[in-house]
Each structure stands twice: as structure tokens, then as C-alpha cells.
């Protein structure tokens, strides 16, 4: 209570209250506000010199006390323009003249920024350096240019004239800042009197004209274009001109004036016009101005969006409707256009004189009516339009086609219409002599004429010619369009440049052979059915049962894969007799053929081609004939293959992350201290539990194995604090970052590439292994899932279908996010980024954060982490993602989503920096219980529903992308999946990548 009274008294200059509090001993240096400003700060800001003297001299409060941002009372005096307080603090209170706060701002910077010329003059006279820079590289001259005070600017340029063209760390010069703030008189002074360079650009490529146009400073734009040599076609790094910036900001007068001054309509680097920018931001007047200058509203940017599309996407329905209405052609009555120059009669007269002069009376020439229409008989256009032709957008492409014809017509040249010429006119185009000067027989000439006639689309030969003459006239136009072999290209070329190479022909031949083979197989289908019926009638019932249910056949114990069937004869050749199953009487050789036939047909009909390797079966004993190194773990080549499939470089990641000299406990070879329960070390790390023995070749665990993956060497409560941790705990944070990068990188790569490419490669490898046949029968081969395992296999197919459908939905969603939205988010300077900002807008606004589903959250984070984030923010976002996915199984999606929101809100409000960590928030949401809270089967806690029927797009083999883009909203949350199922998949995937990280970063130790 007394502290609050002291602050109020200092602001109001209440000396009586201050004396009473001083006598009571209540005036202490620790009395500050929320920003760390003390009593002397508040008295100085208010301009109460007597209070300042009382607090410093009698209450003995420090005159140079710093707030949280490092500002002293001297900074407050300079900012508020209190010269008397500033003089006393510097001369009598022991404050420094050039004290800088945490940003490097000095009193001279603040005096110039807030336009106090008396303080600027006094500080310069007292010896304050005009060359002092802030951490951003700003001089006091830059701050004066922002303030707009001409006197301050003149004082500072006189003190430091060489700083006129000096730029800050972002590339801003004093002239750029003056134009950005709209100070015309300062810009004129800098250019005329100080010689400032108008061609200087910021780091993003923006010039002074761009800055003035972007902020709507009309007079400054006109002055720059009129009285400086700055160009109207100047572009920034993204190809935007001053028209783009004016349209983006909705500055219609500037837009109209620039167009009247001759500014061309140009596309930016991504194909956008100023109309795109105006429509995107809903500036209808700018759209109207651009349309009045004949900008084409149907132009598309590189994303395929028109201005109407962008207006609808951002929720500007009125602007979109206006663009639609203005784009419709309106029929109006028009008078006939004026005659061309020269007039048609004069043109016809000139042509006739030239014909007489040449003396070519025997050659029939085109009439004037064919070349140029006669003006009096010119018809009225059928559908005249109200708007003229759209203004052409400046592109580097050359003029083509109709534009060239229109230009020639305007120049008075008649366009030669070859398709309207009679056959006699084409006769002149065929020479009478060949290249050697020998005469060409007339019948050959006529053949050439008719070929040319057919090629140019002229009429057929006269009907009075007989059939033989027509046959001699050469091939028709349809015959001319056949494909031909080109010696130059060594390929077959089509009439439009189509290319058919030898490889294409080989592929087509193979396809034809496959079709022929399929036809022959269909012919034998009925015969196979008849033979199968005979076998069932002749053979005893148990034998039929044995051939269908191949688990009754002897097989190699411990190996369960799907690559090839296990035959009885093969087992007899490779195993001892005692290794067979207890049922184990060896069957005759011919039974193996029946088993192979039934199994091959089952695989063919069921479609089981290598996708059932995720069968969740307990590990079986490893065959004794395998080497010990196979049992101990994967070979080096096998591990390297798996690492390549992960898409990461282990050595690079380790070099980037592991800087500390010590290794974590999970990687140490020595045992932990005695007395600690298994799995935990005294240093706080949770070691990896013994992993179950899997495939003898050390392959990756299948989809079923990941469900029971345990916490691999790290717990969610591993470190009490990220800030100020020791080397061991820093390594724990690095492990968290690695896990998150592997986890998110895997999902991102799967979403941005063809779905499940690795599984397809494995399927191809399995098919090749099966095609090798008997030569691989010497070693025990794992068996495929039997046809009787259909329900479990269908469950695996259903899981695969859900993931495929999820990835396809992600691709469909990202296809509807304009690239300009992602670019502008990546350049955003203020406020923290959030995943929903990177998703398609719903009704013109981003998706509400509280309605985000887990899959949309991940999709947004993929793009968020692509932005150019500061190093500390990127690190803490990785750690934040780790906590989100780590606690997903135990607390549910709603809880971890609220936790993420709480952390980002704290940072956005300025109450917390990224480097401060978030352990207190984590304890508030998830508690502070020690030990790994990981559940072996987190799906049970989530209450996962049984897998139901999938949408059509999610079935394997169908296209992963839905035909209609999903609509994001709070009702469906942009997802057609069960929320619990998706959380279960993501949770188990995160557990798998924790295991994978432990395996990968233990490689080669």
C-alpha cells in the first residue's frame, strides 16, 4: 500500500506525501512498477525537479537506477523533453551523459526520436557523440528522420554529415525512414541539401518510393517520381513495384496517380499483379481503379489464383462480387469503328497500279475484297463490349500470334488468309525449276500444289477431275498428320512435337504382352476351376486342409515374415529332423507343389504382397544355425540402410547438437550407481529398457511393434529446468530436440512426398526375393501370413489406409494455402507465430486455435518451423513440441493444446522470453510427479474407438488426395478422422521415434 502511494506521489509531485513516507521509512529503492521503473523515473517523467532532488538527496535513492530494459532517469528526461531534470541528473546526480539501455539507445537517440531540439543541442554541446549507434545500427540521425523534426535533423547532420547515407542493420537509411513516415520536408532537405542517395535500398529491396507508397504518403510519392531519378519500375526482392505496395495498402489516390504517370502493370516474382494485392486485402476502390485502367481480372498468379479467388479466400465477399460483376461483358450499342489508314479504296487503287506495272495480267491475284474489307459495306460487330481490351501485363515474353497480327493490321498491312485462297493462287507458290535449274514436269508440280493445298486446308480439287487425278494429287491432310521417324532426334515425332523413343516402344510392347498373358490366364481360369474341383473330390479331406492352412506344414521356428512360403522339402534340406514341428511328419514331395500352388493363388487373390510384416506376434527363439552377431543386433550395413531410410544423417545431427564433452547416462557403458531402481540413474535420466529381440536381420519394427514401444532413455520430467542446466541436462534437452526433429521430419517428408515410399520399396524387395525361387531355399525363409489370418491383415490394411488418407488430406489442405500467405508469415516481425496461421482460412479468417485437431496442429507446425526463427525460439519450440507429444498419451489432446497456448500467450504478452523456459507452466498443467508417466498402451487411456469403415479415398490403392478439398471448421475440425484414433497413431509414432533416436545415436559407439 505504501509503495503504491509513493509511486502515485512521485507522478503527481506530491511533496507532502513523499515527506510523510520518508519519515515513516517507506521510501526504498525496491519500490518499482511492473516494468522496473522506480520513484526517480516517475518523478523525472512528470517533470517534478523538486521531487527528483528530494528523492536523490534526502531519500538517498540512486539517480541512475535502471528499469528492466536498462533505462535510467536520464533516458526518461530525454524522452519527455525535460531539460532541467536532464541537466541536474547529469551534473549533480552522477548519471552518465551517454548511458545506453539494453537496446543501445542513448539520451541523444531519445531526444532526437521525440523531437526535442533543445535537448539535442544541449547534449551535443555537452559532448554527446553523434556517431553512437544502437544494437540495430541506428544513429541519432535515423531517429531524427523518424520524428520529423527538421531542426533536430539539421543539428545532427551538422555534427555527423557522413551519416546521411548510413544504413541500419535492416538496410534503412535516414531518407528511407523519412519517406516511410511521410516527412516530405525532411526528404527534400536530405536530397537537396545533404545529397542523400535515393537509390539506396533496404535489405528486403524496398526503396524510398516503395516505403512512401506502402504507407500512403501521396505528396511524397509525387515528389520522388517528379524530382528524383527513381524509377517507376523499381522492384524489391520479391518483384513488387510501387503499384503493388499502394494496392496492398489500399491507397487509391497514389495508385491512380502512379498509373497516370505511366507506371506499368507488372507481375511480381510469384506472378501477382497489383489487382491481386488489392483484392487480397479487400480494397474495393483500388480494384475499381485498376479495372478502369484495363487490368485483366482473370490473370492468375503462380499458385493459380485470380484476384477473385484471393478476395473470396480472405473473406472479402463484397470485393469478390464487385470483381465478378465488373468482369462480365456488357452489350452496348456501338457505332462502327473508323476506317483504317490508308482508306480501303486508296489501298485497292495502289494494288491495281502495282499489278499493271508488273504486267502479271496472266496470273490471278487476290482481289481487294479478299485482302481488305471495303468500308461502306463493313458489317456492324455482332457483340460489341462496353470495356476495351484489357491492359497487357508486362512480361519478358515476346509478342506472339494474334498480337502480331493486330499490330500489322494497325500498320495498314493486310493479313494473308491462306485458307481462303483458291487453288490457282497456290500454284504460284510452287516453282517450275528445281534447285539445280532443271525444269519440273507439270504433273509433278500439280502434285506439289495439291499437297500444299491439303496442308493449308484449302478446298479439294475441282469435281470435274477424275478419280485417277485425285489419286495422283497426293495424300490428304489426314494422311499428312501421321507420325514420322526423325533421324536427328532418333525417335518418332508427332505432328505437334510428340516424342516416342525406343524405351517407350519397349514399354508399350511389354504392356501388350502383359495384356496378352492376362487374356490367356482368363482362358485357363475355367480349366483351373475344374481341376480344383477334381482335386477336392479325389484327395482326402485332411490333405486339403493341410494345403490350405499352411501353419500345419513344418516351418522354421522364430522367423515370421511374408516373403516366401516354407516348403516341407526345403525344410528337410536345411534343417535337422529334430527342428520340425511336433506334428512333424515330412509330407511327400508332390504335396509341396500343391501347397505352393494354393499359397501362391491365395497371395494373388488376397493381395498380400509384403504389407503384413507388422504382425504382432511374440518373438520366437532364434534358429541355432544363425551367427551370434545376428542375434546381438543389426549389422553395420543393415543399420546404415535403415538410417538412409530415415532420411537423416546421423553424423551431421550429432555434430550439430552434441557439443558438451560428457555423454548422457543412457549412452555410458558403465553401470549406474547401486541402490537406484532399474531404469533410473542418479543424474535423472531414464535409461532405455531392454528391447525385445525382433527380426534376426535387425529390421525396423513394424506398425504393430510401435504400439508397444517403451520410453527409450528419456522421460517427460527429465530435467527440472531448461534454463541454466548443467552439461548433462543440456544433453537431455538436445535429445528432446533430436526426437522432435526426427518425429516431425518423418511426418513432414511423408506428407510432402508420395505416400509410404519406403514400404513400397520393401514390397519390391520382397517380390524380388520371391522371384529368386529355389536358389534361396538353402536357408530357412520366414513364412507369410496365412489366408486364415485375414481379420488381422485387414486390420493392418485399415491402419495403412488411415495413414494414407491422413497424408492425402494434408496434401489437399496445403494445396489450398496460397504461397503468398506463407511468405508473409515467414517475414512477420511482430508477435509469435501459431500453427493455425499456416492453414487455409475459413470464412476469411484463420481457423480458431481452440478448434484445432491434432493433425491440423502438426500440419501447421511443419510450415511454422520452416520460417526463419531466432535460434533460441527454434530451440524452445522444439522442446515445447516434445512436451506436447510426450504428454499426449497421458493427458489427452485438449490438455496439451491448452498447455501450448498458455506458453505462447505468455511469450506474446511479453511476460516471458523464450529463453526463460516453461517448467512452471508444465508443472501447472501436468504436475511435477517424478518418473516416466509413459503407458505401454496409451491408446487405452485415450479411449480409442474400434477402427470403423474408412472413406473411399483412404482405401489402399486409391488416390491419397480427396477430389474435393476438405473444409476446415470447428464442426469437423478439418478432419474426417476419429480424434482418439489420430491421437493414438501420433502417440505411438512419437514413441517409435524416441526408440529410433536412441538406436540411431548409439550407432558406432
Swiss-Prot record:
Compartments where located: Cell projection, Stereocilium
Region listing for Disordered, in residue ranges: 355-383, 458-480, 611-643, 692-729, 764-794, 951-975
Positions with biased composition (Basic and acidic residues): 458-469
A molecular function (GO) term: actin filament binding
Keyword Coiled coil: yes
Primary location group: other
ANK repeats: 1-31, 35-64, 69-99, 103-132, 136-166, 170-200, 204-234, 238-267, 270-299, 303-332
Cellular component per GO, a single term: stereocilium tip
Keywords linked to the UniProt accession: Actin-binding, ANK repeat, Cell projection, Coiled coil, Hearing, Repeat
Tissues showing expression: Expressed in inner ear hair cells. Expressed in utricle hair bundles (at protein level). Expressed in choclea (at protein level).
Coiled-coil regions listed in the entry: 502-539
GO BP field: sensory perception of sound
Known function: Binds to but does not cross-link actin. Required for the formation and maintenance of inner ear hair cell stereocilia and staircase formation. Essential for normal hearing.
Assembly: Interacts with MYO3A (via C-terminus). Interacts with MYO3B (via C-terminus).
PANTHER family (UniProt xref): ESPIN, ESPIN-LIKE PROTEIN
The protein's name in its UniProt record: Espin-like protein
Organism listed in the record: Mus musculus
Amino acid at each position: 500500500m505504501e509503495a503504491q502511494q509513493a509511486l502515485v506521489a512521485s507522478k503527481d509531485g506530491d511533496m507532502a506525501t513523499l515527506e510523510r513516507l520518508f519519515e515513516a521509512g517507506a521510501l526504498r529503492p525496491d519500490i518499482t512498477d511492473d516494468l522496473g521503473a522506480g520513484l526517480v523515473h516517475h518523478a523525472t517523467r512528470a517533470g517534478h525537479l523538486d521531487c527528483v532532488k528530494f528523492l536523490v538527496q534526502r531519500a538517498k535513492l540512486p539517480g541512475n537506477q535502471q528499469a528492466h530494459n536498462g533505462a535510467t532517469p536520464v533516458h526518461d528526461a530525454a524522452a519527455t523533453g525535460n531539460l532541467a531534470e536532464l541537466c541536474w541528473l547529469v551534473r549533480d546526480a552522477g548519471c552518465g551523459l551517454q548511458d545506453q539501455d539494453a537496446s543501445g539507445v542513448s539520451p541523444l537517440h531519445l531526444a532526437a526520436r521525440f523531437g526535442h531540439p533543445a535537448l539535442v543541442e544541449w547534449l551535443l554541446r555537452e559532448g554527446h557523440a553523434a556517431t553512437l549507434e544502437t544494437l540495430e545500427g541506428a544513429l541519432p540521425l535515423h531517429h531524427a528522420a523518424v520524428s520529423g523534426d527538421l531542426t533536430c535533423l539539421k543539428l545532427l547532420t551538422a555534427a555527423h554529415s557522413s551519416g546521411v547515407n548510413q544504413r541500419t542493420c535492416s538496410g534503412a537509411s535516414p531518407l528511407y525512414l523519412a519517406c516511410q513516415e511521410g516527412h516530405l520536408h525532411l526528404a527534400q532537405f536530405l536530397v537537396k541539401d545533404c545529397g542523400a542517395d535515393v537509390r539506396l535500398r533496404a535489405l528486403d529491396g524496398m526503396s524510398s518510393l516503395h516505403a512512401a507508397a506502402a504507407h500512403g504518403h501521396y505528396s511524397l510519392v509525387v515528389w520522388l517520381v517528379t524530382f528524383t531519378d527513381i524509377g517507376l519500375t523499381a522492384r524489391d526482392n520479391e518483384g513488387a513495384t510501387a503499384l503493388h505496395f499502394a494496392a496492398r495498402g489500399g491507397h487509391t489516390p497514389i495508385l491512380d496517380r502512379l498509373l497516370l504517370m505511366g507506371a506499368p502493370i507488372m507481375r511480381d516474382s510469384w506472378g501477382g499483379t497489383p489487382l491481386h494485392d488489392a483484392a487480397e486485402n479487400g480494397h474495393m476502390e483500388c480494384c475499381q481503379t485498376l479495372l478502369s485502367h484495363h487490368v485483366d481480372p482473370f490473370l492468375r498468379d503462380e499458385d493459380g489464383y485470380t484476384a477473385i479467388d484471393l478476395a473470396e479466400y480472405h473473406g472479402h465477399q463484397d470485393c469478390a462480387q464487385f470483381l465478378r460483376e465488373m468482369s462480365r461483358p456488357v452489350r452496348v450499342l456501338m457505332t462502327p469503328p473508323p476506317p483504317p489508314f490508308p482508306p480501303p479504296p486508296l489501298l485497292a487503287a495502289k494494288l491495281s497500279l502495282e499489278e499493271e506495272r508488273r504486267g502479271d495480267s496472266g496470273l490471278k491475284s487476290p482481289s481487294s475484297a479478299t485482302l481488305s474489307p471495303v468500308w461502306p459495306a463493313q458489317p456492324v460487330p455482332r457483340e460489341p463490349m462496353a470495356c476495351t481490351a484489357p491492359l497487357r501485363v508486362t512480361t519478358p515474353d515476346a509478342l506472339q500470334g494474334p498480337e502480331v497480327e493486330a499490330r500489322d493490321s494497325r500498320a495498314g498491312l493486310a493479313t494473308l488468309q491462306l485458307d481462303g485462297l483458291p487453288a490457282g493462287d497456290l500454284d504460284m507458290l510452287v516453282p517450275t525449276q528445281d534447285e539445280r535449274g532443271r525444269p519440273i514436269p507439270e504433273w509433278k508440280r500439280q502434285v506439289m500444289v495439291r499437297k500444299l493445298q491439303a496442308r493449308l486446308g484449302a478446298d479439294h480439287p475441282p469435281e470435274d477431275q477424275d478419280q485417277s487425278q485425285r489419286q495422283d494429287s497426293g495424300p490428304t491432310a489426314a494422311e499428312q498428320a501421321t507420325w514420322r521417324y526423325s533421324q536427328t532426334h532418333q525417335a518418332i515425332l508427332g505432328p505437334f512435337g510428340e516424342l516416342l523413343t525406343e524405351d517407350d516402344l519397349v514399354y508399350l510392347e511389354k504392356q501388350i504382352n502383359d495384356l496378352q498373358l492376362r487374356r490367356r490366364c482368363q482362358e485357363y481360369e475355367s480349366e483351373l476351376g475344374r481341376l480344383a474341383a477334381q482335386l477336392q473330390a479325389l484327395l482326402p479331406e485332411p490333405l486339403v486342409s493341410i494345403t490350405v492352412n499352411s501353419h500345419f506344414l513344418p516351418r522354421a521356428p522364430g522367423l515370421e515374415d511374408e516373403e516366401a512360403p516354407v516348403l516341407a522339402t526345403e525344410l528337410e534340406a536345411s534343417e535337422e529332423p529334430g527342428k520340425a514341428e511336433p506334428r512333424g511328419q515330412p509330407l511327400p514331395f508332390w504335396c509341396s507343389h500343391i501347397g505352393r500352388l494354393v499359397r501362391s493363388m491365395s497371395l494373388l487373390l488376397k493381395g498380400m504382397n509384403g504389407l503384413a510384416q507388422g504382425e504382432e506376434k511374440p518373438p520366437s527363439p532364434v534358429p541355432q544355425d544363425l551367427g551370434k552377431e545376428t542375434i546381438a543386433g543389426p549389422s553395420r550395413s543393415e543399420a546404415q540402410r535403415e538410417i538412409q531410410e530415415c532420411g537423416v544423417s546421423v553424423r551431421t545431427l550429432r555434430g550439430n547438437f552434441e557439443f558438451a564433452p560428457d555423454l548422457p547416462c543412457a549412452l555410458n557403458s558403465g553401470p549406474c550407481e547401486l541402490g537406484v531402481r532399474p531404469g533410473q540413474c542418479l543424474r535423472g535420466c531414464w535409461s532405455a529398457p531392454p528391447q525385445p529381440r525382433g527380426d534376426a536381420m535387425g529390421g525396423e519394427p513394424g506398425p504393430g511393434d510401435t504400439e508397444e514401444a517403451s520410453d527409450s532413455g528419456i522421460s517427460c520430467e527429465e530435467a527440472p529446468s531448461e534454463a541454466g542446466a548443467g552439461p548433462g541436462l543440456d544433453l537431455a534437452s538436445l535429445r528432446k530436440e533430436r526426437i522432435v526433429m526426427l518425429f516431425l521430419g518423418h511426418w513432414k517428408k511423408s506428407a510432402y512426398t508420395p505416400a509410404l515410399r519406403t514400404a513400397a520399396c520393401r514390397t519390391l524387395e520382397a517380390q524380388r526375393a520371391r522371384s529368386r525361387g529355389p536358389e534361396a531355399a538353402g536357408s530357412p525363409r520366414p513364412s507369410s501370413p496365412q489366408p486364415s489370418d485375414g481379420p488381422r491383415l485387414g486390420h493392418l490394411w485399415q491402419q495403412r489406409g488411415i495413414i494414407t488418407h491422413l497424408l492425402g488430406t494434408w496434401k489437399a489442405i496445403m494445396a489450398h494455402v496460397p504461397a503468398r500467405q506463407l511468405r508473409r508469415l515467414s517475414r512477420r516481425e511482430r508477435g509469435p507465430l501459431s500453427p493455425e496461421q499456416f492453414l487455409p482460412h475459413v470464412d476469411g479468417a484463420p481457423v480458431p486455435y481452440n478448434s484445432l485437431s491434432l493433425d491440423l496442429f502438426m500440419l501447421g507446425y511443419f510450415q511454422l518451423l520452416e520460417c526463419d526463427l531466432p535460434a533460441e525460439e527454434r530451440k524452445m519450440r522444439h522442446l515445447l513440441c516434445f512436451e506436447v507429444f510426450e504428454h499426449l498419451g497421458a493427458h489427452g489432446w485438449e490438455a496439451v493444446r491448452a498447455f501450448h497456448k498458455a506458453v505462447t500467450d505468455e511469450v506474446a504478452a511479453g511476460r516471458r522470453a523464450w529463453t526463460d523456459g516453461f517448467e512452471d507452466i508444465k508443472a501447472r498443467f501436468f504436475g511435477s510427479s517424478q518418473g516416466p508417466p509413459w503407458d505401454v498402451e496409451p491408446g487405452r487411456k485415450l479411449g480409442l474407438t474400434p477402427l470403423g469403415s474408412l472413406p473411399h479415398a483412404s482405401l489402399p490403392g486409391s488416390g491419397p488426395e480427396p477430389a474435393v478439398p476438405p473444409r476446415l471448421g470447428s464442426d469437423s475440425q478439418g478432419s474426417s478422422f476419429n480424434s482418439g484414433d489420430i491421437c493414438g497413431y501420433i502417440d505411438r509414432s512419437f514413441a517409435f521415434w524416441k526408440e529410433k533416436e536412441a538406436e540411431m545415436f548409439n550407432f558406432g559407439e
